């Protein structure tokens, strides 16, 4: 109830003068804010703004489309800039993600990598057994200098052998719900310990109450993974469910 209370406060008492010194406000992940939150932002910060985001990274329906209601809040003279070139991902990853979201107008930066693979398994345990086999992380924690040295050595070996086999610093198992993430974490904990993996230092469950982020294998949900980057990612979703809302969750992951 905090946002309705804040809205009533600013409507009744006016704007806090401590914000008057702010000349320009930058809002990121614009798709994650509601209409009420934007109304509060407008009252709190009567200054120029730059609002950034990815419209496709939302689980809301068309009635909550930020692009649709922002002009009604900030005025019709707002300037809209659409950035259609993607630099972050490889062509293979970006093409796969855009297909999930039905995006066709994006220009992809010419950078290639391994293609995205989709595999089906009878259940979560079998899927995570495959994750353990394909995971490319050091089993024990190492210093940053040691990690750089090992990566260089692995890359030199891979180059000599014509392969791309080397260890990563970070990896993630991304699920749909918090319960699925918790279940996956405990399954992975047992299976990785059996493989000699230092799970205390190299395995973590990232949730809403987490206070730190460490290297190694992170298990989390698609909505907690937003804004984070990993060297290797395993997205574990129910294969039979291809509904629009689940496809959007896959895109975000």
Cite the ranges covered by each PLM segment.
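Coupling/switch/interface segments within P-loop NTPase motor domains and analogous charged loops
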Residues: 1-5, 135
């Amino acid at each position: 109830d905090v946002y309705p209370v804040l809205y009533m406060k600013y409507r009744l008492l006016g704007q806090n003068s401590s914000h008057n010194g702010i000349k320009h406000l930058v809002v990121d992940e614009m798709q994650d804010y509601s209409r009420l939150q934007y109304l509060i932002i407008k009252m709190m910060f009567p200054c120029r703004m730059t609002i950034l985001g990815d419209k496709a990274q939302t689980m809301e329906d068309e009635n909550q489309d930020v692009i649709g209601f922002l002009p009604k809040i900030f005025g019709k003279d707002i300037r809209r800039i659409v950035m259609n070139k993607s630099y972050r991902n490889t062509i293979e990853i970006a093409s796969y993600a855009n297909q999930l979201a039905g995006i066709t107008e994006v220009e992809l930066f010419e950078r290639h990598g391994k293609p995205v693979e989709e595999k089906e398994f009878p259940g979560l345990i079998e899927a995570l057994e495959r994750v353990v086999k394909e995971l490319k992380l050091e089993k024990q924690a190492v210093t940053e200098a040691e990690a750089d040295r090992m990566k260089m050595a692995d890359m030199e070996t891979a180059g000599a052998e014509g392969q791309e086999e080397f260890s990563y610093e970070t990896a993630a198992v991304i699920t749909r719900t918090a319960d699925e993430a918790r279940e996956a974490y405990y399954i992975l904990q047992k299976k990785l310990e059996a493989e000699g993996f230092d799970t205390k230092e190299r395995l973590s469950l990232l949730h809403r109450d987490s206070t730190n982020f460490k290297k190694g294998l992170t298990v989390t949900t698609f909505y907690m993974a937003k804004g984070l980057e990993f060297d290797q990612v395993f997205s574990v979703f129910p294969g039979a469910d291809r509904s629009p809302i689940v496809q959007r969750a896959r895109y975000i992951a």
